[in-house]
Amino acid sequence: MGQYFKVHPVNPQLRLLNRAAEMVRAGGVVVYPTDSSYAFGWHMGDKAALERVRQLRGIERDHDFTLACRDLSDIATYARVENWAYRLLKALTPGPYTFVLRATHQLPKRLQDPKRRSIGIRVPDHTIAQALLGVLGEPLMSSTLLLPREQFPLTDPEDIRDRLERQVDLVIDGGSCGMDPTSVLDLSGDEVVVLRKGKGDVSAFES
């Protein structure tokens, strides 16, 4: 039976987030709120947790996941960022964007796109997500909480608990959350390519 923490959306309780971080380090799968939707989170070095999320979401092995980072310094560790891309990242983070970047050798190959050797990275603009990343002290692998046969992510934390309490280790209740996906911008080449229009404004990058 998974645990259920009610975390204050403005002043998150540090003791609860410390326990959440301990679960992640121990190989747990947690559900946490972001600025776009609720998401699964797990330690980037844990293969078993990765497989659990694949099964929960009903997705194939070639599905790309996202690395949730606290700030730009984390991004620079796991992705190669050109100067022009860095300026864009600085302007758009934190926020509802996922950026596709070329991965560095610090990132395990199983987490990279097998063909392009890239990774999707985001910096969530959400108090609880930021606090969790701060306590954890490293990025968190992340995937939208979209279940098989569902058209939209789950948004109500009590509904999430009722449906997943036997399948995840923790649900962090940060209140009702949105269901809009992030906008995805590919920065792995020489210019910005919009891969998905979502919550973040992409009008500046469309011709």
Give names to the regions the model predicted.
Residues 1-207:
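Active-site-adjacent structural elements in enzyme catalytic cores
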